[in-house]
Amino acid sequence: MSKITSSTLLKFKQEGKKFTALTAYDASFASAFDSEGIDVLLVGDSMGMVLQGHDDTLPVTVEDIAYHTRCVRRGIKRSLLIADMPFMSYATSEQAMTNATALMQAGANMVKLEGGHWLLDTISKLTERGIPVCAHLGLTPQSVHVFGGFKVQGRDSDNAQRILDEAKAIEAAGAQLLVVECIPAPLAKTISEALTIPVIGIGAGADTDGQILVMHDVLGISSGYIPRFSKNYLKQTGEIREAIRAYIDEVAQGIFPGSDHTFN
């Protein structure tokens, strides 16, 4: 199979083909996800919670992400690999450049940053220097203490308009992908239709161009709180590779996410 690139995902969007993404942190799981057809793998700062046992993502370091990016890179042949920029690793454009370079050298194809208007200059500088950017709007977990918890964003008209405006500005700044997390499905649909670049949803309804989940949720091995937007595919299939295929098939057919996994 041909390698997935940002151009591939753009073509999928133009053709109306839904694509799938998962988090991954090691070579073995990454290889399984890659070979079963997951299009995008994210070395997420979610590792702070699902691997390291923290209450949030804030303790994760650039070194943590780089280590796991190298591990995942060794396990994949096809999937596009995105690495999260962890908390405060891109507070300035100079920091962003240094840390994004380290993650690209670790094997990432793209880096992901959380935030809106304040990031526009950083996004432009990274893309101008050959570092592709995936942006992240809505519930941005690194800002959990500002939000007062893991809460749905964009439910009132003012915040919905702000998120839409930020999405358009981020695209204009040069971002090649956008993740929207925990926003009302109608808002996610509006954003996906308004942008040329592909939009990946998590807890954002079925009308985004792609879907992403945390691998621990898909495999039913998360401890503690289970997000409403997640689905345990291993429970219904009994085998890891079958679970991944079921996830891919349900996204392609528009079955997942259903109303039980969506906010309005």
Swiss-Prot record:
Residue numbers annotated as active site: E181 (proton acceptor)
Pathway in which the depicted protein is active: Cofactor biosynthesis; (R)-pantothenate biosynthesis; (R)-pantoate from 3-methyl-2-oxobutanoate: step 1/2
Residues annotated for 3-methyl-2-oxobutanoate binding in this entry: D45, S46, D84, K112
Record-level GO cellular component terms: cytoplasm
Documented EC number(s): 2.1.2.11
Assembly and oligomerization: Homodecamer; pentamer of dimers.
Record's protein name: 3-methyl-2-oxobutanoate hydroxymethyltransferase
Species in which this protein is naturally found: Shewanella sediminis (strain HAW-EB3)
